[in-house]
């Protein structure tokens, strides 16, 4: 093989994209991964890291440009780690995400008879995030900075705008930055593990415009608290809720367990089509409301509900998908391991007058067996696990339960593919639909239909 060493300057043609959106150049079948390079581009690059099985390169020049290359509209794109694909046209982003799913399910796992649909995209793939988590820090000049992290680091890029956040969020961010400076609020310094203000979190109701502002602090004592609230209300009189979240752990976890309401309500309200949801500062709620409706509508289509089915909603969170399905089902049973989420789900069921729902706290594999012993037999099981996918014991429980259909929503198609191989013992994977929940990033969500063989 041709010698490859750090700092070498080389040229080559990009032959593929990784799941992280990096261009792939090969030298005698040895891959070099180059951020922001696109397929079919002829490029000049510098080797910056060499490993046993791959190398990392830095793009220097593009000699032949891809027809899918576009100018990134964000002035922070080259430095910020929030987006990875702004240099790729949106149509090509959707195709890339479909290719990721095809590669996982058909090329690697050999689900050759399973249909992979086109990625469901957005008409306007910007300003879609209804929740922003913004780190607060200080620069070398000891000035307050707020923004997002540089890729693969905890270096904060000081920003005034973000094109994938709700526009209200950047207004709040810039106002809060000014308030923190004016009132000389102590700023948390991660390396020293000292200081007070750690993060600003903003949540908005996509359909209601209700807004919650959360200050995450390293400890409860906050001398300027009342003055900050007063200035926030002067700037944003329509704010629904202002909260302080206490996080005195020295970890990467953004929020702590204790929250104090400083102004207004404990929760905000949002809607997904005809369903209404109370959202707390800690609630899991899909980030992209517009795409969530498309995702859930596809899930209902896959569930094939006629009004006579019993639905089991596992990993149910605050009950969003279960309550979305309840009007179309005979009864929905939801199970979730987080107690506060089940409390929210029960309240949301009351708000939506869903009398055909039951929400229980516990491990899904254990609660399912309890329901089975009570004679409860689901026709459809909804699965929407975290990124790590389903526990194998849960999969084995599903296989003994034998529902007619399993509808599996995933934020990590790689673990969904792993679980699909286990389900294949008794289930046929009919089709998978990618949904673009996070445009301009490499993340892809999928919803899959499994039918009992």
From Swiss-Prot:
Q: Which residues form the active site?
A: 411
* Gene Ontology terms describing biological process: rRNA base methylation
Tell me which InterPro entries the record gives: MeTrfase_TrmA_AS (IPR030390), MeTrfase_TrmA_CS (IPR030391), NA-bd_OB-fold (IPR012340), SAM-dependent_MTases_sf (IPR029063), U5_MeTrfase_fam (IPR010280)
GO MF assignments = 4 iron, 4 sulfur cluster binding; metal ion binding; rRNA (uridine-C5-)-methyltransferase activity
Detail which positions bind [4Fe-4S] cluster: 74, 80, 83, 162
Q: Which CDD domains match?
A: AdoMet_MTases
What EC identifiers does the entry list?
Answer: 2.1.1.-
Keyword check for Transferase: yes
Q: Which PANTHER family match?
A: RNA M5U METHYLTRANSFERASE, TRNA (URACIL(54)-C(5))-METHYLTRANSFERASE
Which family, according to the similarity comment? Belongs to the class I-like SAM-binding methyltransferase superfamily. RNA M5U methyltransferase family.
Q: What NCBIfam families does this protein map onto?
A: rumA
What is the name of the protein in this document? Uncharacterized RNA methyltransferase SAS1819
Q: Which organism is it from?
A: Staphylococcus aureus (strain MSSA476)
């Amino acid at each position: 093989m041709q010698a490859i060493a750090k700092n070498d300057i080389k040229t080559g043609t990009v032959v593929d994209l990784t799941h992280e959106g990096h261009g792939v150049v090969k030298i005698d079948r040895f891959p070099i991964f180059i951020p922001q390079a696109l397929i079919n581009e002829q490029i000049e690059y510098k080797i910056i890291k060499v490993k046993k099985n791959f190398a990392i390169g830095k793009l220097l020049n593009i000699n032949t440009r891809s027809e899918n290359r576009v100018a990134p509209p964000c002035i922070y794109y080259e430095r910020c780690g929030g987006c990875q694909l702004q240099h790729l046209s949106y149509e090509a982003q959707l195709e890339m995400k479909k290719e990721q799913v095809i590669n996982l399910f058909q090329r690697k796992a050999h689900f050759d008879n399973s249909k992979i649909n086109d990625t469901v995209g957005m008409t306007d793939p910007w300003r879609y995030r209804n929740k922003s988590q913004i780190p607060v820090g200080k620069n070398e000049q000891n000035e307050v900075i707020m923004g997002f992290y540089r890729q693969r680091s905890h270096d904060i890029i000081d920003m005034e705008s973000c094109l994938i956040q709700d526009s209200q969020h950047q207004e709040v961010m810039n106002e809060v930055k000014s308030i923190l400076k004016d009132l000389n609020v102590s700023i948390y310094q991660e390396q020293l593990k000292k200081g007070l203000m750690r993060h600003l979190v903003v949540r908005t109701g996509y359909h209601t415009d209700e807004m919650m502002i959360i200050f995450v602090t390293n400890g409860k004592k906050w001398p300027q608290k009342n003055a900050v609230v007063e200035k926030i209300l002067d700037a944003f009189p329509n704010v629904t809720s202002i909260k302080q979240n206490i996080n005195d752990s020295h970890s990467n976890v953004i929020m702590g367990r204790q929250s104090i309401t400083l102004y207004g309500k404990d929760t905000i309200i949002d809607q997904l089509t005809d369903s209404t949801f109370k959202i707390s500062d800690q609630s899991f709620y899909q980030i992209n409301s517009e795409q969530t409706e498309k995702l859930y509508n596809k899930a209902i289509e896959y569930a094939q509900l006629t009004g006579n089915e019993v639905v089991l909603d596992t990993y149910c969170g605050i009950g969003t998908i279960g309550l979305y399905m309840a009007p179309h089902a005979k009864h929905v049973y939801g199970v979730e391991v987080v107690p506060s989420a089940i409390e929210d789900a029960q309240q949301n069921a009351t708000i939506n007058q869903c009398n055909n729902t039951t929400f229980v706290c516990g491990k899904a594999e254990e609660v399912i067996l309890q329901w089975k012993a009570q004679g409860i037999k689901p026709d459809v099981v909804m699965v929407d696990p975290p990124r790590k996918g389903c526990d194998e014991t849960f999969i084995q429980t599903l296989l003994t339960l034998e529902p007619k259909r399993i509808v599996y929503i995933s934020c990590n198609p790689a673990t969904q593919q792993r679980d699909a191989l286990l389900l294949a013992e008794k289930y046929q994977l009919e089709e998978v639909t990618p949904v673009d929940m996070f445009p301009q990033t490499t993340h892809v969500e999928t919803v899959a239909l499994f039918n009992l063989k």
